[in-house]
Amino acid sequence: MAPVAFPTSFFLCLLLASGLAQAGRLLVVPMDGSHWFTMQMVVEKLIHRGHEVVVVIPEVSWQLGKSLNCTVKTYSISHTLEDLDREFKYLSYTQWKTPEHSIRSFLTGSARGFFELTFSHCRSLFNDKKLVEYLKQRFFDAVFLDPFDVCGLIVAKYFSLPSVIFARGVFCDYLEEGAQCPSLPSYVPRLFSKYTDTMTFKERVWNHLIYIEEHAFCSYFLRTAVEVASEILQTPVTMTDLFSPVSIWLLRTDFVLEFPRPVMPNMVFIGGINCLQKKSLSKEFEAYVNASGEHGIVVFSLGSMVSEIPEKKAMEIAEALGRIPQTVLWRYTGTRPSNLAKNTILVKWLPQNDLLGHPKTRAFITHSGSHGIYEGICNGVPMVMMPLFGDQMDNAKRMETRGAGVTLNVLEMTADDLENALKTVINNKSYKENIMRLSSLHKDRPIEPLDLAVFWVEYVMRHKGAPHLRPAAHDLTWYQYHSLDVIGFLLAIVLTVVFIVFKCCAYGCRKCFGGKGRVKKSHKSKTH
C-alpha cells in the first residue's frame, strides 16, 4: 500500500499554528498614509492569533489606528492635521511643477518639510512620561515598526527590544549598512537611478555618483532625526547605530519585481502582501463593468497622494481617455475636466484590487507605487505607468524592462502619447502574456506573504530576536570589512620578500661579476 502524501498546506498550517500557544506582547510603531494599509493587515492577523498588541500613534493622523481591536495609545504633537495636509500637498504640487528625479533634489527639496514634521513626532512621544512609563512596564517581546519616520527604531533601542522592520525599502544606503548587505554599484541600481542591472559604462559611472551623492546628502536630510534620537537616548548615535540591531527586515518586494542581488539571512521578502482575494463588486461598479461591453474597462488611479492634477494636464488626460473604446474608471477627487468624455467615469474611490481582478479589465494606469504595481502583477493586468517621485520611477523601469507595461513622463506626455500607450498595452498581446508570466511566477510560492510576515514577527517574539542571523560584519571596522589590513599585511610581506630577493640578487651579482672585473683590472696593472 502506497504511503499517504500529506498536502503541503498541512505542514504550513502546523508552521503557522506553532505560535498559537505562545501568545506574546507586541509594540507597534507605524507610519501614516499608504504605509499603514499593508502593515495593518499584519497587525490584525497577529491580534486574531491571540497576541496582545499595543499600537502607539500621534493623536493627529490620516489613517492610523482606525478600526483596530487592540490597545491604541496616542500622544499629543505640536502640529495640526492642517499642517500635515499642507506639507503633503506641497510635496505633491512640487512634483507637477519641478520634478525631483534625483536623491539630492528630493531629500533636500519638497520632502524635507513633511519629514521634519514626522521626525519630530518621536520627541513628543518621549515627552509623554506617563506613556513612556506605561510602555516600560508592559515588557514587550518585540517592536514591529516602519522605519520611515525613524521613531520605531528609537523606541526599540531605548527599551532594548528586538525589532522587525516592515518596509518597501530604505532611503540612502541604510539597508546595506543596517543589514550589512553587499550592494555593488556595478550591477545593483541605486534608488532614483532608473537603471537596470545591466548597465553601460556610462550608467555604471552615474550609478557610482548617485551612491556618492547619497552619502553626501542623506546625513543632511536625516539630521533632525539623528538629533532627536541622540537627545532621547542621551548619547550620540548615527542612523547606522539605529538600523544595525534590527532582527528581521520584512521587505515588501520580491525578485519578480526586483533585479537579482545579494541578500542577507535576516531579509525576508513579502512582495504582494497587499494582494487580497478578489471580492465581488458592488452593484455600482458591477454596472459600470457590465455596461462596457466587449471592449472592457481601464482602471486609472494615481494613488492617495495625487488628489488634484493641474487643469491643462487633466484635460490632456481626459482627451486621450476619450479616444479609446474602453470604459475608463478614473479615481480622481480634483476638478472635473470640462472635456471629459462619456466613456470616462470619475469616482472618489474605487475597489482597485477587485476591479483589476475582473476578466473585463484590459489595462491599468498607475503612478507605479509598489501597492499598485503588485496588484497589477497579482491580477495579470498590463500597465501604463506615470511615475512621479520616490521609488515610482524605478518600479516603472523594472516593469517596462520585463515587457509588462509602458512608461510615460507624466509632465511631458501629450494626449497622443497616452492614447498610443493605452492602445499598445491593450492590443499588443505580448504585454498581456508577459504580465501573466510574472503573475504566475509571483504566485508560485510555498506560503502566502501575509502568513510569512506573521511567522517571522512571531519568531522574533518567541526567541527574543534573531541574533544567529546577524552577520559578524556588524562588529568589524570599515578597514576590516574590506580586508584592507589583510591586504596591507600580505602586500608588506610580498614587498619584503621582493626586497630581500632583490638584495640577494644584487649581492650575488656583485660577487660574481664585480669580483672578476677587479681581478682582470689588477692583472692588467701587473702586466704594465
From Swiss-Prot:
Its EC number is 2.4.1.17. The chain crosses the membrane at residues 486-506. Pfam families: UDPGT. Residues 1-23 form the signal peptide. It is found in: Endoplasmic reticulum membrane. InterPro entries: UDP-glycosyltransferase, UDP_glucos_trans, UDP_glycos_trans_CS. Glycans are attached at residues 69, 290, 428. GO terms for molecular function: glucuronosyltransferase activity. Belongs to the UDP-glycosyltransferase family. UDP-glucuronosyltransferase (UGT) that catalyzes phase II biotransformation reactions in which lipophilic substrates are conjugated with glucuronic acid to increase the metabolite's water solubility, thereby facilitating excretion into either the urine or bile. Essential for the elimination and detoxification of drugs, xenobiotics and endogenous compounds. Catalyzes the glucuronidation of endogenous estrogen hormones such as estradiol and estrone. Homodimer. Homooligomer. Interacts with UGT1A1, UGT1A3, UGT1A4, UGT1A6, UGT1A7, UGT1A8 and UGT1A10 to form heterodimers. This is UDP-glucuronosyltransferase 1A9. It comes from Mus musculus (Mouse). The lineage of its organism: Eukaryota, Metazoa, Chordata, Craniata, Vertebrata. The gene is Ugt1a9.
